[in-house]
Amino acid sequence: MILAGCLLTLLGTAQLGTAQEKNKIRFGKISPEDFQKTSYDLDTGAHAVILADIGSSEFEAEQASFKLVYKRHRRVKILDKTGYDAATEELYLFKYGSNKEDKVSNLKAATYNLENGKVVETSLESKGIFTENMNDDVIRKKFTLPAVKEGSIIEYSYTIYSPSTYALKAWNFQGEYPCLRSEYTVGIPEFFDYIFIAQGYHQFDSKTREDVRKSFTFRFDQQGAYGTKTGVTESQTVGANVSMYRWVAKDVPALKEESFTTSIRNHITRIEFQLSARKYPGQPVEPVMTTWPKLREDLMKYESYGIALGKNNGFMADEIEMITDGAKSDEEKARKIYYYVRNNYTCTDHSSLAMDKPLKTVFKSKSGNVSEINMVLVAMLRKAGLNAYPVILSTRGNGFANPLYPMLGRFNYTIAEVSTGDKLHFLDASYPLGFDKLHASCYNGHARILDEEVSAVQFDADSLLEQKLTSIILRQENGTLKGTFQQRPTYFESYVLRGQVKEKGKDDYFKPLEKVFTKVSSPTIGDLDSLEGPVMVKYDFEYETNGDDMVYLNPMFNEATKSNPFKSLDRKYPVEMYSAMDEIFTLNMEIPEGYDVEELPKSTLVKFNEDEGLFQYMIARTDNYIQFRSRIKLNKANFPPEEYVTLRDFFDMIVKKQGEQIVLKKKK
C-alpha cells in the first residue's frame, strides 16, 4: 500500500503542478447519447458505473471565525438491478457542542431515463429525505433516488457547512463501483497547516497546486467597557494566500473485498486530513495536533476513559483479596484476577474505545463493552499492587492505526498490559481466551501502551503461528477399514469450536461426519475448558469397501484442502492472513485384506519463495501398510501484491495434490 503523511504546504510545484482542468459536468445536463453505453471496458461485469464524482472543500469567513464548505456532485449509470444500491446515499452530519453542528444545503437529486428517445427527469422530493439522530453527536440524512431502473442515470449534489476547522473532509477516490473520473479540490488558507495522509494503489492522473489570493471578511460584536456588548457590529477584511490542491483519478477500478483482508478501508485509494497548526496574523503558531504523551494525558483525564484509574477504587478491595488469596507470585496474582474477570464478566460490544459507564458500575454489574471490561481488569491488577496499563489498538476490521500521527479516532479497542518480573503480558478478558492470548482480530499492527512513555507495540499477524496436527490410524478388520481420528486444531479454530459446542452441543459438531464415514463412534472433544491451549478432537470410524473391485480413497478423507481461497487472477492489495501456519496431517493405513495397491499418488515437496514456506506430500508403501504425511507451512501471514500469483498457484497445487486418491484393486 502507498501510505504517506506529509505537510503538503511544504511541497513545491515540482511535485504539484498548477494546471487547472475545469469540471465540465453540469447538473441536469443529460443527453440521449449518455444512455447509449450499456457496459464499460473498465469493468464489463459492473452493476453500476460512477460517471463522475466531483468534490471540493474550502474555507469561508463566518462571523469572527472560519467555516468549512464541502460540496459534492456525483453522477452514476445504473447498469442492472444489482446496481440499484448505488441510488441510495447517506450523509453524516456532526455536532460540536455549544449549538454548533454541520448543516446541509442545496441538496438536489434526480433520476434520468430515456423514453421514446427523450430524456425524462424525475426529481427527488423533500419527503424522500429521511433524517435520523444516530446518537448525541451524529445525524444521518438518507435518500434513495426515485424511478430507478436498468439503464437509468442518477445524480445528486449537496453542500455541507461545518463550523469546525477540524472537519476537513476526507475523499475516497475508489469504492465498490468503478469510477470514470473522481476529483477533489481543497483550498487551504495560510492560517492553517494540515497533514495530508494518502493511501491506495491507484495512481492519480493529475495532482496540482495553485496559490491564489483571497479576502475573508469577519464580523464581530463591538465590545464596550468591561466586556459589555454595544450592539454595534464591526467588520474586518483580511487578505490571505490560499493554496488550492486538486487531485484527479481516472478509470478507477472497483475495490472488491477478497479473502484474507484486514479491512478494505486500509487499501482504498483515499486522502484524508489532520489539522496540525493554526497561524493567525500577529499571533504565535498554535500547535493543534496532539503528541502521544499529550494524547495519553488527555485520555487518562477523560470521564469516559481513564480518570477512574487514578482513583483509590476501594470498592474493589474485598473482592481482590478473595480472588488473590493464596497467590505465591505476581504472575499467579495476575492470572487469578484475569481468570476471574474473564469468567464472570459479559462483553456487550467488541468495538468501543470509550467507556459508557463509570468503572464502579461496570465492576458491580459485571457487564460492559471491551474497553470497560479491560479497564476494570487494569484497575483490579493495580489494586492488587501490580504494574498494569491500558493498551489502545485498532482491530482488523477497523483499519490500521497510524504509527506516525496520534489520531485517536483510529483506535477502537482496549486491552490490558501487566508486567510480572521481566515479563510483559497482554490480556483481553472480553473473550474466553487463555492468559497471554489475544483474539486474532487484535493482530493488526500498531498499538500504544498508555504508560508514561506511551510505548509503541506491534501486534503483527506474522508473529503469530497457528499449528494444527491431525493423525489417522486405519486398520482392516474382516474387509472393513476401521480408523481412529485425532486432531489438535489451531488455537483460533479451537476458540471457534468451543463457541460452537457451547451454543449447539457436541452432536452438532460431529453430525457432518455421517456423510463421510459409514459409522462414527466414541466422539470426544477434550480440553474444552482448558483455555490455555487448543482442544483435542477424537473419534473412531468405519469405512466400508463394500467388496468393490476398485476402491478409491483420499488419504486425507475430509481434511483435504477442497478449494483455493484465492480466486482472482490478480490482486492490487496485500494478502493478510490471520497468522503464519503449520498444518501437519499423517495417515498410517493397513491395506484391507483381499486388496492390493493399484496406484499411489506421487510424493512431492514444493517450497514457497525458497525459505518462506513449503508443501510436503509424502506417501509410501511398506509391506502391507501405507504411510502418508502432508504438511502446509507458511512462515508469514502477509504477502505483498507482487507475490499474489505465486501464492494463488501454490494453493492451486495444494488443492489438486490433496485431491488425489489411493486406488486399491481387489485381488483375484
Go through each PLM region and give its residues.
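Secondary-structure boundary elements
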Residues: T291-S365
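Short coil/turn segments at secondary-structure boundaries
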Residues: A86-E90, A198-G200, A308-F315, K336, ...
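Bacterial Sec-dependent N-terminal signal peptides
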Residues: M1-N23
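Beta-strand-rich, non-transmembrane domain signature
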Residues: A19-M289, L299, L359, E372-R382, ...
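Sec/Tat-exported extracytoplasmic proteins
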Residues: T82, S162, T324, V341-Y345, ...
